[in-house]
């Protein structure tokens, strides 16, 4: 390995270790805190009925005309998000642990290349500020998690009030799948000026946006498209 390759390897592995440490810390912290959902007005922030700014029902389904797959979507504030991770079979994408059932459960894992061409017509890759707005809208609450797919979480605590159904599908480093049931990461289409891209990271009771160590060449993450 040359010095650049070694530095990248160390940075990426530090990132993976840090992700695991954050999960462990937050699990301990959450055991000492109370439910943060007091005063959260689900009906106004992410209503299940009515129509959104696009004239669509606030929650519904659409079909990706490329392969006929149907996806759920949900409205959160002024944003409309896919309520399932993308499962379009693009070159280089794969299922967690290479098991087709995991593509059905979590969607596909993608390299951070040609991201702007992966979402269905009428949808686009989110930027980091799209996820920032999401965090502000839901007040960093975990009402976007799907119950039954997270370790160390009681199904009675978080009930996916906003319908976004985030599942702990982990990620992949090169071809090695990691962290299922613990966390999940999603690509944005936004670079930090190098070949590192910002990602949206979710772990149990913690969400963040960062570009540290998220190389488009080695890391594989999921995609949630947002309505254009």
Each language-model region and where it sits:
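Hydrophobic alpha-helical segments with strong N-terminal bias
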Residues: 14-15, 95
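Conserved positions within compact, well-structured domain cores
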Residues: 35-228
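Sec-dependent signal peptide recognition
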Residues: 15-22
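General secondary-structure edge motif
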Residues: 12-13, 205
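Conserved active-site regions of diverse hydrolases
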Residues: 25
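C-terminal motif of bacterial Sec signal peptides marking the signal peptidase cleavage site
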Residues: 28-31
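N-terminal secretory signal peptides that target proteins for export/translocation
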Residues: 1-12
